[in-house]
Amino acid sequence: MAGKKRESSLQIALSNQEQWEEALSTKGLQVVDVYQAWCGPCKPTVSLFRKIKNELGDDLLHFAVAESDTIDSLVKYRGKCEPTFLFLAGGELVAVVRGANGPLLQKTIIEQLAAEKKVLNQGSERHVIKDEVLLEEEDEIAPVQAQTEDEELVPSGKSYTVAIIKPDAVAHGKTDEIIMKIQESGFEILANEERTMTESEAREFYQHRAGEEKFQELIQFMSSGPCHILIISKSEEDEDVIPAWREFIGPTDVEIAKKEKPESLRAQYGTEVLYNAVHGSNDREQASRELAFFFPNFKISNESLKELTSVKPERTLALIRPEILKERKDEILQSIKDAGFSIAMQKEVMLTEHQVQEFYKEHINEDYYPALLKQMTSGPVLALALVKDNAVGHWRNMLGPASLSQALSEAPDSLRAQFAPSDSETNQLHGSSTTEEAKKEINFFFPVEHTLATIKPDALEEHRDEILEQIQGAGFTISQIKEANLNREMAEEFYKEHKGKPFFEQLVNYMCRGPCLMMILSKENAVHEWRSLMGPTDPAEAQKVLPDSLRGKFAKSILQNAVHGSSNSDHAMEKIKFIFGDIDLDRIVHESFGETPETSASDISRNAAAQGDDPEQDESKEMEE
C-alpha cells in the first residue's frame, strides 16, 4: 500500500474534463502522461519521474496521468498506442515527447522547467507550441474524412480482430480464395489493405516473440513480400469474434492443424509453423494494439471501445508436473499458445518438501496429499505465468476436472484428460482457482527480484542513454543507481571469483579505465530477465541470435561487451551489498511494487538457481563478468 500512496502523490490522476481544466491552472510545469483506458499509464517512467522529482526537489514541477477516453480536450489523442507526454505551463502546451524515452524525458523536463522559471521570475515570453503530429494527421485525414467516416467505424456492439494473410499465401495466389472462405463462414471484413512490411515494421509488430529461436526467420519471412491486412468482425453483434477467428484459422503448427482441424485455413493453406498462411490476434488487448499499428486512423464506436476496455487481460499460474514435463512439454506449450495465451514468464524448478507444503498448505489434510507431495518432489516442475482476457477462467476450463477419473469420463478433450499419465491417479496440470490466488501463486514462483547491473566504461561513454532507455522499456525499475570509478582494489574484489584466470589482469585494467554505472534493477524474475536483455557474452553470437539485445547492439568484444549482470540470486545479493552496502531491499519492493514477496518465494528463486534453472548461470566462470 505504501507504494501506491507514493505513486499517487507523485502523479495526480485526471479522469474528467473538470479535473483537466483544474490541472491547467497549476503554477509551474506539469508533465502529463496521456494514456488509453485499455493499456493504462506508462509504468516504466514512474521511477524516472520520482528520481527527477527527488533530485530537483522543485515545487514548480508536477506530474499527472490523464485518461484521454474521458477528457474532451484530449479527444485527438484517443486510439494512440504510443506513450505520449504533454508538457504544460500556464495552461498551454510547451513540449511533447512520444515514447518512453527516459533520457529525452529527463532532458525536456529540465529544459522546460528552467524556461518556465524564467517566465515566472523574469517575465520572459512563454514558447507555446501545437502538436505537429496531430496537425499532420488532420491534414492527411481531412480530404477523405467525409466519405470514409461511416466505412471506418466499427459498428456499435461488435468486437473485432486483426487478421493477416501472410506472404506465402499471397505469393501462391490464394488471397481471393481465403477471403471468400472468410466471408462464407459469417465473418465481415471491415477493411482490407495490401501492404509489404519492412524488416523494422515486422520486428516491431512481433516484438513480443523476440525471445523465440526462429524470431529472425519470422521477421525475414513477414517482410519478404506483400501481405493482406484485414479487420474482421462477426455478423452477429453478441458474438466475440476473436475466439471464433482463432478456431477458424486452426492451430499454429500446420501438422497439428491438418490432423485436428483439417477444415481450418492453416490446414488448407499452410506448409509449416512460420509459413502457416494466416495470423490472428490472441486477445482483445493484442487486437487493439494491432489495429493501432496497421490502421491508426480507424475509428471505434464508443460502445465498442467500452466493450473492449471492460475486459482487462489477467494473469494466472500454470504448473506442468514432473511426470509429463519431460515427455510432453512441447505439446502442452503448443496447446497453451494455440488457446491464445501469452507466456509472460516461465521457470523450471525442483521443489523441496517444505516448498510443496507451503504452496499446498490448504491441501495437507486431504487424502490425496501424500501422492501429490511425492509427485511434486519427484522431478522438475515447470511454472508458467499465463496472460489472456479472463485467464483464470479460460485456463481452468481448459484443464477440466481436478479428479483424473472424472476428467477422463466427463471431459475427454480437457488437458488433464489428454495428458493423463498411464500409471498415476494424480493429474499433471495445475491452475489457480481465483484471481487473488493467481496473484499469490505467481508471486510464489516469480517473486520481485533484484539484480546488479553494470554499464561498463566504454558503453557508458558512448551508449548510456540508449541502454537506459532499453532497460526501462523492458519493464525494469531502476531502484538504485550510481556512477562509480572502480580503483584497482575494488575491481579485483568485484571480480574475485576470476582471480588467477588468464584474463583477470586484462579485465581489472579495463574496468578501471573509466566510470561505470551501477544499478539495482527490480522486476519479477529480474536475474533471468536481465541476462536475457543483455544477450550472449560473445557479441558475434549476440548479433546472430539476439541482435536487439544490449550486447548485440553495443558490445565490441568479449571483454568490452557493454554490460554486466549477476549470474544468480545469491551472486546478485553479494554484489549489491559490495556496491551499495547494507540496503533494505524489502523496503524497495514495498515502495516500488506495493507488496512484499513471500519468504517461500525467495526460497524458490534460490532453489531454481541451485538447480541450474538459468541456462546462463555458469557464465560467471567466463570473461563477461
Curated annotation (Swiss-Prot):
The protein's role, per its UniProt record: May be a regulator of microtubule physiology.
Q: Which Pfam families match?
A: NDK, Thioredoxin
The record's principal subcellular location, in a coarse class, is cytoplasm
Q: Where is the composition biased (Acidic residues)?
A: 613-625
**Molecular function as annotated in GO:** nucleoside diphosphate kinase activity
Gene Ontology cellular component annotations, sorted alphabetically: cell projection; cytoskeleton; dynein axonemal particle
GO term, biological process aspect, one: GTP biosynthetic process
PROSITE patterns from the entry?
Answer: NDPK_LIKE, THIOREDOXIN_1
Q: What is this protein called?
A: Thioredoxin domain-containing protein 6
Q: Where in the cell is it found?
A: Cytoplasm, Cytoskeleton, Cilium axoneme; Dynein axonemal particle
Q: Where is this region: NDK?
A: 158-302
* Family under the similarity heading: Belongs to the NDK family.
- Coiled-coil annotation reads none
Quaternary structure and partners: Monomer and homodimer.
Q: Where is this region: Disordered?
A: 594-625
Give the keywords, sorted: Cell projection, Cytoplasm, Cytoskeleton
TM region(s), chain numbering? none
What InterPro entries has UniProt attached to this entry?
NDK-like_dom, NDK-like_dom_sf, Nucleoside_diP_kinase, Thioredoxin-like_sf, Thioredoxin_CS, Thioredoxin_domain, TXND_domain-containing
